Amino acid sequence: MLSLKKSMLLLFFLGMVSFSLANKRSDGKRADEEGEDKRADEEGEDKRADEEGEDKRKRFLPFLIPALTSLISSLG
């Protein structure tokens, strides 16, 4: 059976892999949107990308912070 330390590290790395895959998927969607939306100016695209980045951080940080704190406390 996995120890708590190993299971927390495994959970952390699985989370990072899923986050990486989600970023790749959103990059592909963004490329499709840019192909359809060629008339949009650069400022509008930058603003949309910034908003998408903020949304990703808002979804990921609540998961990451408790996982990291529990990982640190289990290692210490």
Swiss-Prot record:
Q: Where is this region: Disordered?
A: 24-54
Asked if Signal is a keyword of the record, the answer is yes
Query: What tissue expression does the UniProt record report for this protein?
Result: Expressed by the skin glands.
Pfam families the record matches: FSAP_sig_propep
Keyword annotations for this protein, in alphabetical order, are: Amidation, Amphibian defense peptide, Antibiotic, Antimicrobial, Cleavage on pair of basic residues, Fungicide, Secreted, Signal
- GO CC terms in record: extracellular region
Q: Please give the chief subcellular localization of this protein.
A: secreted
Q: Where are the transmembrane segments?
A: none
Q: Does the record carry Amino-acid biosynthesis as a key word?
A: no
Which family, according to the similarity comment? Answer: Belongs to the frog skin active peptide (FSAP) family. Brevinin subfamily.
Protein name, as recorded: Senegalin
